[in-house]
Amino acid sequence: MNISHTRREFLQWGALLLTPAGFAQKVTPNRVTTFAGTGLRGTAAEGDTAGHARLNNPFHIVIGPDGAMYFSDFGTSRVFRLDFRTSKLSIVAGTGTKGFSGDGGPATSAQLNGPHEVRFDSKGNLYIDERDNHIVRHVEMKTGTISTVAGTPGKNGYAGDGGPATKGLLNQPHGITLDRFDNLYICDPLNNRLRRVDAKTGVITTFAGNGEGVRAPDEGSLTGTPLAGPRSLEITRDGKWYLALREGNGIFLLDGAKKTVKRIAGNGDSGYSGDGGPAVAARFGSLGPGGLTGPKGLSVSADGKTMYVADCENHVIRKIDLRTGIISTAIGTGQRGDGPDGDPAQCKLSRPHAVLVRGRTLYVADSENNRIRRLEPA
């Protein structure tokens, strides 16, 4: 796939909303709208318009270097591109059938299995973590060729540190990100570790976590601290690293230079409380399917002042003022439901897995409503 559209085009269209008919209109501030999906679960096809497409558990969303939106559709095991100018979808990776195949060939002919997060490196190439194949894959966007860069397809476990990442073992990787040097970081939640793949050597190591899935102290060392269920890692423009712990019900600041971790949100207990007070005293998550709790996705504003958190099992998006440390709810009621669009305080969500802030616009992967929603704050 050849990236041809520019970031400038995205910025020009970023203040417009794609309606279900596929046309653009001005966004009404402080109202939630449906950006993509009908709410009906199905299989989106090449060329579908955003408002007519039937999504199936959209899990993660990013803006690519071409200014388009890319998202993983967990239920169909595909990755899609959404063009802001035309509102049309195109398939980037996956056949729609779960499995493992296709390395060395076109990503659109490859089988994926449970894609969670998608990210781009500095060269504009795409990375996909596949939970149920226990791997991370790479798509060369100029050619569309897919390959495996970490993990052993179909095999789970914890092994391989110090050797080639493609011979290592992961256990249901859920989140990925890349630093400015294109080193790859993998949230390896069932191993309770954050793994790192060196961009130059391809060697995998453990970057953070000691493998214990117990409650973490408020501060500790990178590799000596228990990190229960690392779920998503966000690296900000100003170089701060934030890690969400799913089973740990917290968010931690990682300092690579000092090799330390520090709690900045979540007291470690599950629940839904704390709005209006310190984020470190708040509770995230509640017992959901499989007993999963805690935050599932993070996004920080470009100025570094605000963090948004997908509090999946509470069916809300939380907001943290990183200057004051105060937490609040940005979207959702705390009850599971489907909208209605409009007032963010009254719009019910259903297990949102990801949130993305770009400029003043907030996008939400409202996963089990099979929608991507949008909020333009007042």
Go through each PLM region and give its residues.
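Gly/Pro-rich loop segments of beta-rich domains
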Residues: V27-N57, S87-G114, G144-Q172, T201-G229, ...
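Short loop/turn segments immediately following the C-termini of beta-strands
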Residues: F74, R131, P189, R246, ...
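A short loop-to-beta-strand structural motif that recurs across blades of beta-propeller domains
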Residues: R78-F80, H134-R137, N192-R195, V203, ...
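Residue-level detector of Asp-centered blade-edge/turn motifs that repeat once per structural unit
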Residues: I63-D66, F120-K123, L178-F181, I235-D238, ...
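Blade-level signature of beta-propeller repeat domains, shared across WD40, Kelch, NHL, RCC1
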Residues: R351-A378
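Conserved beta-propeller blade signature
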Residues: A68-Y70, N125-Y127, N183-Y185, K240-L243, ...
